[in-house]
């Protein structure tokens, strides 16, 4: 029951935030009648609507305001929630789920990428994170023939490249390690507790990198990419990194600037963009991408 109520809160939040100019109760009720969560297609009682609104600040941290004059449109008051990546991702995922549910008659024409399932593993890890409990896990890496078991401190989880990853801290190595959830054979939440460092921030850890490798030992550098062709529009609508900015633009190309760490994941990403992306700076990154390109060219000789 609690899960269903939470989904309704998510639906209401997404419905209101999607209305750029606000939305009336009548419009919300009409959308609710067509919503996949409303199996019987009933109208939304105003009392229920009020209860949902009153619960949003506690449940999701969302505050809704209403215009003081007709037609009394509702809108999100604290737009800063859009900077909450987890809430934003959850709302988008739920909205997509509703769209697919309402389009069952064309389900064979709606395609999504497969994400390795690790729901139970993710649930156990998130529970341990909330409780600051150690976890025991049995792990099988991709690059070895053996598996091993150990205790560790679950600090954070991250979704990257259609895979969930655990960032966990090892006291014996005095560093964080990254584990693919689909490679965890078994995981248990332990009673043993740990203290999260007061200054730890997963967002800050990955602030200057892409993917799952933070590369904190690498310097933060200014990166310049010269992008041409279709890739200009693509990167304009889906930036490579939050620090992306336009440095120069002409009829044929756009030069973007970034503040990043030049990790191996960045090198691989830029190599994959092919001839439409040229690294201008730094020289070391340009050389790494060049070496990758030469290796690929050698394969296809």
Predicted regions and their residues:
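Short, basic/aromatic recognition patches that contact phosphate-bearing ligands
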Residues: 1-87, 295-301
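Short, hydrophobic/amphipathic alpha-helical patches that form generic packing surfaces
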Residues: 7-15, 91-95, 267, 271-272
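A residue-level signal for conserved active-site and pocket-lining positions in enzyme catalytic cores
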Residues: 12, 49, 132, 225, ...
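Bulky hydrophobic/aromatic content
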Residues: 25, 54, 60-61, 65-141
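A structural signal for short hydrophobic beta-strand segments in well-ordered beta-sheet cores
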Residues: 64, 157, 246-247
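General beta-strand recognition
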Residues: 73, 136, 165-167, 255, ...
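Core beta-strand-centered patch of the WYL/Sm-like small regulatory domain
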Residues: 109-224
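Polybasic (Lys/Arg-rich)
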Residues: 205-301
């Amino acid at each position: 029951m609690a899960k269903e109520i939470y989904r309704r809160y998510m639906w209401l939040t997404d419905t209101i935030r999607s209305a750029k100019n606000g939305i009336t109760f009548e419009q919300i009720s009409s959308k609710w009648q067509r919503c996949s969560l409303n199996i019987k297609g009933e109208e939304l009682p105003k009392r229920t609507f009020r209860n949902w609104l009153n619960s949003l600040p506690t449940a999701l941290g969302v505050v809704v305001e209403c215009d003081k004059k007709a037609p009394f449109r509702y809108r999100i008051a604290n737009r800063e929630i859009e900077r909450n990546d987890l809430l934003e991702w959850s709302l988008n995922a739920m909205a997509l789920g509703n769209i697919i549910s309402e389009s069952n008659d064309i389900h064979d024409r709606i395609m999504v990428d497969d994400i390795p399932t690790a729901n139970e593993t993710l649930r156990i890890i998130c529970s341990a994170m909330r409780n600051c409990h150690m976890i025991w896990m049995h792990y099988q890496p991709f690059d070895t023939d053996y598996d091993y078991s150990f205790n560790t401190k679950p600090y954070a989880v991250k979704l990257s490249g259609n895979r969930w990853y655990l960032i966990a801290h090892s006291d014996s190595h005095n560093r964080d390690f990254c584990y693919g959830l689909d490679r965890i054979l078994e995981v248990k939440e332990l009673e043993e507790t740990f203290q999260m460092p007061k200054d730890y921030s997963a967002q800050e850890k990955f602030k200057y990198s892409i993917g799952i490798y933070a590369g904190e030992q690498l310097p933060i550098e200014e990166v310049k990419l010269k992008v041409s062709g279709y890739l200009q529009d693509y990167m304009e609508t889906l930036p490579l990194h939050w620090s992306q900015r336009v440095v120069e633009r002409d009829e044929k190309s756009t030069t973007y600037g970034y503040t990043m760490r030049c990790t191996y994941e960045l090198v691989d990403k830029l190599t994959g963009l092919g001839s439409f992306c040229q690294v201008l700076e730094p020289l070391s990154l340009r050389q790494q991408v060049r070496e990758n390109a030469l290796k690929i060219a050698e394969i296809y000789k």
